[in-house]
Regions:
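Alpha/beta enzyme core
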Residues: 1-150
Length: 150
């Protein structure tokens, strides 16, 4: 998407009273400018539309989520697998807009249902409180009462 054109069009439409849900790439500056002109929903891509590549830059997408906690974020484009949809939810995004993944699936109805089920499972797992990510190994088993321990 054209950043300048999208920002300019969004600003004009917002002034006319429209609610604008702009499609963007994963550039945080682009997102920030859209928010500055008044957009309440931003729809960054996971990867270029129709490619099915998934989330090619998870760090950028996470930074967008972390930077704009009060903005509704809907990932739009690039989803190709059910696991991609789960990643989006795990990043804290509010939703997913997908078309190509369903429309081009061999069994679209089955794929759509699978995405729905996976997203519900990802949401449920987040509510269950997954463990924190650590850069070092942390055993979860006690050594108390184990043979050969000093």
């Amino acid at each position: 998407p054209s950043a300048k054109g999208t920002i300019k069009a969004s600003e004009k439409l917002l002034k006319l009273g429209f609610k604008v849900l702009p499609y963007t790439n994963d550039d945080i500056s682009f997102c920030r400018e859209l928010i500055k002109v008044g957009c309440k929903v931003i729809m960054p891509w996971g990867s270029p539309i129709g490619t099915g590549q998934g989330l090619v830059n998870i760090k950028k997408l996470k930074k967008i989520r972390d930077s704009f906690k009060d903005i509704t974020l809907i990932l739009d484009a690039g989803i190709g697998r059910v696991s991609h949809a789960c990643q989006v939810i795990e990043l804290g995004y509010d939703g997913i807009l997908l078309n190509s993944a369903v429309a081009l699936a061999k069994k679209p109805e089955n794929f759509a249902q699978s995405v729905y089920d996976a997203v519900r499972a990802a949401e449920k797992s987040l509510k269950a409180g997954p463990i924190s990510i650590s850069s070092k190994a942390i055993p979860s088993t006690t050594f108390k009462g184990m043979a050969f321990q000093k």
